[in-house]
């Protein structure tokens, strides 16, 4: 109840300031009591997520019309339970993480259903994964197609979680990509037609968190290859590459594949900020970053 009260007040304040709020249902903060029951490993977890979405719709949809179900499943499953770099810092077997991923996507489907059923007005519902954008070295057709092919390809099983297609094809097309079904066959959970119908509940918009990318060209062997960045190329305070081109090519490739309105749901950088003598952070680096990225749209 305290959480609902807080968000009710926040929504009202945003609206009073002329700001349209968007709600993301899940941005990695899993309830501990449900985590102790297995979290996304538990086959009941999609139902739990649907019940939660029902409450959100009942409490907030009189004022909020735009919703994203999940934020960056590649991170909260991959980095959280596979690489062990994010909370809860586990390194689970491949088979377990693929089951978690499947339940996560089923939870997305249950949330879409709940938002549609219990929304107090027509709602705009989306999904917000992330990726490292692969952009072409030139606008020549062979480089563009090399970048596109590499972007939607599936990594080998030891790095399976960081990709586009495994997380998005089921949501849009109602099927996992064949390349992944072959590569990950020995580790897959049971996947039913009913599961895929649930996962592919129709959405209205597709979000993408875009920060940076890698440059790709067609190699002499006819396969995509990465073009290495020159020494001294610009990076952020977190040592992420600054690649404005990704804000053009990422949405372009995603829209051409999935045919949904593309929302850039996150973008930005960490800076080495300093307080100037006048007591202000003038933020020239961030201003420059945003101007260069936005110029690519």
Task: Kindly label every feature range from the protein language model.
Residues 5-296:
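Active-site region of glycoside hydrolase catalytic domains
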């Amino acid at each position: 109840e305290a959480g609902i009260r807080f968000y009710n007040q926040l929504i009202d304040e945003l609206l009073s300031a002329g700001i349209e709020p968007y709600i993301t249902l899940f941005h990695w903060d899993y309830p501990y009591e449900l985590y102790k029951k297995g979290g996304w490993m538990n086959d009941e977890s999609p139902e739990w997520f649907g019940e939660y979405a029902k409450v959100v719709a009942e409490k907030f949809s009189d004022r909020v019309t735009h919703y994203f179900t999940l934020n960056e499943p590649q991170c909260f499953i991959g980095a959280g339970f596979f690489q062990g770099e994010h909370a809860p810092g586990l390194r689970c077997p491949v088979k377990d993480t693929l089951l978690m991923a499947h339940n996560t996507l089923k939870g997305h489907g249950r949330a879409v259903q709940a938002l549609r059923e219990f929304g107090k007005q027509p709602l705009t519902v989306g999904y917000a994964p992330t990726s490292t954008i692969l952009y072409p070295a030139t606008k020549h057709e062979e480089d563009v197609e090399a970048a596109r092919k590499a972007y939607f390809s599936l990594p080998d099983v030891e790095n399976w979680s960081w990709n586009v297609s495994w997380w998005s094809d089921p949501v849009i097309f109602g099927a996992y990509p064949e390349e992944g079904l072959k590569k990950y066959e020995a580790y897959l959970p049971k996947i039913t037609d009913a599961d895929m119908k649930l996962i592919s509940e129709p959405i209205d918009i597709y979000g993408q968190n875009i920060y940076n990318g890698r440059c790709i060209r067609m190699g002499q062997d006819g396969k995509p290859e990465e073009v290495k960045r020159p020494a001294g190329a610009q990076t952020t305070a977190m040592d992420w590459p600054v690649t404005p081109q990704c804000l053009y090519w990422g949405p372009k490739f995603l829209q051409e594949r999935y045919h949904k309105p593309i929302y850039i749901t996150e973008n930005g950088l960490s800076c080495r900020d300093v307080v100037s003598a006048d007591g202000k952070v003038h933020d020239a680096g961030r201003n420059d970053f945003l101007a260069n990225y936005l110029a690519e749209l």
